[in-house]
Every structure is written in structure tokens, then in C-alpha cells.
Design a protein with these regions (language model features):
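N-terminal ordered "arm"
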Residues: 1-49
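A short, compositionally biased
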Residues: 2-5, 129-138
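OB-fold/S1-family single-stranded nucleic acid-binding modules
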Residues: 45-49, 54-122, 133-191
Length: 191
């Protein structure tokens, strides 16, 4: 996101999604803001880590209701989960905000589409990674028998591409910010 970072996770006690943001408008976080501290030093936050952070207030957007404005306290690492535990955090929506690769922002604004949550961790079928003719990273898969073809923002695309047969076919899907009248569905993490 604009050379910055989008981080999200689930609360371990309630399975509720939270997305830390830098301002009331849902701005992405700087590299400094996503560092955590543990007894060995300061490091960049990675997926599957259990991180403690404090926030100033809930700042929901109509397309991203999980947003929380963080304060300036350094995050703390509190263990990690391993990949086999991801199943404990799966979401079970009937679909991924419809069957297209995007959602009309006007339909969200006009409440024709209500976004109750903009993040899902889901188990998918027929999962494939590829680069399209424009060299853009994509994932195709079925969820609840509906075919999807979405952009991939997971920074480990190449690594996952080379080990696709070892993956659990679990994806974190995020509804992105408004861009040219749409909120695009993004594969933010692959497990």
C-alpha cells in the first residue's frame, strides 16, 4: 500500500478482526510503526505472530469496519501460532462479497452492499498462483463452489509459488481501499 504496510489480525480470545491504521482515514502504517519488541530486540511484524498493541480508538470505514487507530507505543510480541493452528481462525462466509474481483464503492456508500467485515481467512479449492500478461501476481481458486481470480499482495508470492503443493490452500482475503470507484479483493496472505 503506497510503499507502506497493511497489517491485520484476529484477537486470540474472540476471533474478531482488527486492522491497525495510522489515522482516522485508514492510512497504512510506516515501517517504524509495524516493528515489535521482544527480549532480543526490535523486528518487523510477520504473519502468524501474536502481537500486543494499544490503540486510541475504533475508526471504522464503511468499507473497512475493523480499523483501529494505533497509538505511538512499540508493539510487543507475545508468541506465535504455527501454520497448523490457522484452521482455528477460519471464517465461513457464504461468499467473498459477491463473485467478482471487486465491489462497487458507490454500492457500499449507498448501502446496497453492507460490509460487515473486510477481512476473511478462508479455505479454498482448486488454488493456483500465476502471473498474468502484465506480469501481475494473481490467484485463482474456488470458494463455496464460486470461482475467483484475485490480485495477490502477499509479499511471499514467489516462495509460495515454488511450494504450492505444500500449501494448505488457506487465504487471507482483504477488501482494499477505494480505487477508481471500486474496492478490490486482495489475497493478502497465503498459507
Amino acid at each position: 500500500k503506497h510503499s507502506k504496510h497493511c497489517i491485520a489480525g484476529k484477537l486470540v480470545d474472540s476471533n474478531k478482526w482488527v486492522r491497525p491504521v495510522a489515522n482516522d482515514s485508514g492510512a497504512e502504517l510506516s515501517t517504524q510503526q509495524i516493528k515489535y519488541k521482544n527480549p532480543y530486540g526490535k523486528f518487523l511484524t510477520k504473519t502468524l505472530q501474536i502481537i500486543k498493541f494499544t490503540y486510541l480508538k475504533h475508526v471504522p470505514l464503511i468499507n473497512q469496519p475493523e480499523n483501529y487507530l494505533i497509538d505511538d507505543q512499540v508493539w510487543k510480541q507475545n508468541y506465535s501460532i504455527n501454520e497448523s493452528e490457522i484452521n482455528d481462525y477460519l471464517d465461513m462466509p457464504s461468499d467473498l462479497w459477491g463473485s467478482e474481483d471487486r465491489v462497487s464503492y458507490n454500492e457500499i456508500l449507498n448501502k446496497k452492499i453492507v460490509i460487515k467485515q473486510s477481512l476473511y481467512i478462508v479455505k479454498v479449492d482448486n488454488f493456483k498462483l500465476y502471473k498474468n500478461s502484465s506480469n501481475k501476481r494473481r490467484a485463482s481458486f474456488n470458494y463455496n463452489k464460486v470461482p475467483y481470480d484475485l490480485a495477490v499482495t502477499d509479499p511471499f508470492f514467489e516462495k509460495n509459488f515454488s511450494r504450492i503443493n505444500e500449501l494448505q490452500n488457506i487465504l487471507c482475503i482483504s477488501l482494499g481501499e477505494e480505487y477508481r470507484g471500486s474496492c478490490f479483493k486482495l489475497v493478502a496472505a497465503i498459507y
